[in-house]
Curated annotation (Swiss-Prot):
Keywords recorded for this protein, A-Z: Cell membrane, Disulfide bond, G-protein coupled receptor, Glycoprotein, Membrane, Olfaction, Receptor, Sensory transduction, Transducer, Transmembrane, Transmembrane helix
Record gene name: OR6V1
Superkingdom in the source lineage: Eukaryota
UniProt xrefs under InterPro entries: GPCR_Rhodpsn, GPCR_Rhodpsn_7TM, Olfact_rcpt, Olfact_rcpt_6C-like
Identification of the protein by name: Olfactory receptor 6V1
Organism: Homo sapiens (Human)
Single GO term (MF): olfactory receptor activity
Lineage: Eukaryota, Metazoa, Chordata, Craniata, Vertebrata
Length: 313
């Protein structure tokens, strides 16, 4: 006999309040999604193909671009298809899987940002020991831990959601299976789960943010002591793109998920989720290109090479 407190499927309202105008959102969102996918793919290909980018900094950058693609894929394709159909239904299992991968990949991206901050800290504050401290093996270990820890930690989190009693309906007022809308449908006592969520946010978001801030505190102090203006400018330009990614990534997540006792309107959650799922992955390749001189130089070189091949044919 089926468990009536666990629906077989959920209805994702998405942008149903727009009515027939939903179809007009499809084109802009699809374009942003495709540009985000292509932009981050170009970054990954550049990191793999160009030997100038075979360094720890760009190894982590390639990981981050891959994460941007994967995080976007957990929610946006589903959102795009729902814009064109009247019945926006996701199975219970599909909802739990989407929840698991969305938050696991999102947490991993914050840890990779922290790895990037540690790399810049060692490069600028301890340049003579950089080759030893940031060896290939160490980079693989740091990246491996950043990927493994959230995926393991999210297992009990998603299992707890799967065993809740959902007797307040089956309609999720969002375009993906977000945490708070799911808990609002449950008639179980979720106080312990909410406390666990807060601990997870402290572990993967606030702690990594704190490590990043401390690292950049040391970096700024060290850079300001550099007598050469050109070296100082180079150091800041190298870190500028990373700092921009840190600000965009952490601000929206801390706003939504870290504050205890939080309560945000449905529309606010949807807008912030759109920023993190669509707009941020779209902007990141441009931030990395315009703020990072090395990436810009490599990209220009690849474009010149491609132009030369086209002329030769």
């Amino acid at each position: 006999m089926a468990n009536l407190s666990q629906p077989s499927e959920f209805v994702l309202l998405g942008f149903s309040s727009f009515g027939e105008l939903q179809a007009l959102l499809y084109g802009p969102f699809l374009m942003l999604y495709l540009l985000a996918f292509m932009g981050n793919t170009i970054i990954i290909v550049m990191v793999i193909a160009d030997t100038h980018l075979h360094t720890p900094m760009y190894f982590f950058l390639g990981n981050f671009s891959l994460l941007e693609i994967l995080v976007t894929m957990t929610a946006v394709p589903r959102m795009l298809s729902d814009l064109l159909v009247p019945h926006k239904v996701i199975t219970f299992t599909g909802c739990m899987v989407q929840f698991y991968f969305h938050f696991s990949l999102g947490s991993t991206s914050f840890l990779i940002l922290t790895d990037m901050a540690l790399d810049r800290f060692v490069a600028i504050c301890h340049p003579l020991r950089y080759g030893t401290l940031m060896s290939r093996a160490m980079c693989v270990q740091l990246a491996g831990a950043a990927w493994a820890a959230p995926f393991l930690a999210m297992v009990p989190t998603v299992l707890s959601r799967a065993h809740l009693d959902y007797c307040h309906g089956d309609v999720i007022n969002h375009f993906f299976c977000d945490n708070e809308p799911l808990l609002q449908l449950s008639c179980s006592d979720t106080r312990l789960l909410e406390f666990w969520d807060f601990l997870m946010a402290l572990t993967f978001v606030l702690s990594s943010f704190l490590v990043t801030l401390i690292s950049y505190g040391y970096i700024v102090t060290t850079v300001l002591r550099i007598p050469s203006a050109s070296s100082c400018q180079k150091a800041f330009s190298t870190c500028g793109s990373h700092l921009t990614l840190v600000f965009i990534g952490y601000s929206s997540t801390i706003f939504l998920y870290v504050r205890p006792g939080k309560a945000h309107s449905v529309q606010v959650r949807k807008v912030v989720a759109l920023v993190t799922s669509v707009l941020t992955p779209f902007l990141n390749p441009f931030i990395l290109t315009f703020c990072n001189q090395t990436v810009k130089t490599v990209l220009q070189g690849q474009m010149q090479r491609l132009k030369g091949l086209c002329k030769a044919q």
